[in-house]
């Protein structure tokens, strides 16, 4: 049984470049250029992350979470939650990696945002499971970054009140609600359930979201989160306003 450990090394370490290997890479880059440079929409606003802090909701996070909820609203989904760490790039008007016009969004730019191949998962959570998931997500904003800041949640369809007891998040109230003023309806409580959509990394307990592994009526959609975002960009055609803040 191997008892060693991984060792970081310089990526070239003085090794000469092999022309035959470089040719394979160059061919692959050329073959995928058509897909990467395909324009899927336009934006007159920047969709940016809260980067590098990842301690609060972001315009890009709201866009992705809203797209998730909208995609599955017709099958009973009430809320969406994804993790900040899954968002790997911004969508900026000034970015033109494929030579496209400023403001145009390419498939490659969308892929840079969500490159991990995660799929969406729908499940029903109890109130207690939802609260536990949110408490895990709000650990970084409360100062507990021991597990990294990527767990900070980006969500849609929820209005959440919480406070920090030292470094421990305490969820005070959760509503099913659209962004805007504090809801005046009663918040969720014991006995309530919520149908949510998340990603398969979080569903498997990634970023500490073990509470999401215990949902019921689970539906593995098979839809890539990347495709859900692209579908929303194509549906809008042009993004002219930022998503409302929850």
Which functions belong to the PLM regions below?
Residues 1-9, 58, 62-246:
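Feature captures C-terminal
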Residues 1-42, 159-166:
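Binuclear metal-dependent phosphoesterase catalytic core
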Residues 12, 16, 52-55, 220:
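Alpha-helix capping and helix-loop boundary segments enriched in small/acidic/polar residues
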Residues 36-57:
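Glycine-rich phosphate/diphosphate-binding loops and the adjacent beta-loop-alpha structural elements
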């Amino acid at each position: 049984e191997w008892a060693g450990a991984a060792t970081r090394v310089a990526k070239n370490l003085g090794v000469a470049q092999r022309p035959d290997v470089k040719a394979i890479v160059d061919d692959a880059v050329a073959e995928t250029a058509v897909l990467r440079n395909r324009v899927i929409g336009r934006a007159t606003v920047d969709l940016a992350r809260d980067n590098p802090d990842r301690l609060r909701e972001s315009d890009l996070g709201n866009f992705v979470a809203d797209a998730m909820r909208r995609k599955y609203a017709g099958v009973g989904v009430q809320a969406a939650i994804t993790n900040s760490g899954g968002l790997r790039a911004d969508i900026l008007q000034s970015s033109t990696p494929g030579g496209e016009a400023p403001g145009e969004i390419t498939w490659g730019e969308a892929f840079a945002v969500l490159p991990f191949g995660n799929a969406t998962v729908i499940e029903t959570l109890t109130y207690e499971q939802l609260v536990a998931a949110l408490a895990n997500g709000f650990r970084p904003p409360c100062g507990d970054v021991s597990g990294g800041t990527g767990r900070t949640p980006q969500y849609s369809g929820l209005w959440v009140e919480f406070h920090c007891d030292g470094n421990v998040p305490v969820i005070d109230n959760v509503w099913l609600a659209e962004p805007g003023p504090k809801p005046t309806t009663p918040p969720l409580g014991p006995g309530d359930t919520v149908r949510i959509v998340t990603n398969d990394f979080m569903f498997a307990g990634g970023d500490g979201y073990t509470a999401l592994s215990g949902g019921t009526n689970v539906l593995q959609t098979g839809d890539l989160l990347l495709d859900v975002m692209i579908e929303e960009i194509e549906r809008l055609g042009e993004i002219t306003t930022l998503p409302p803040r929850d």
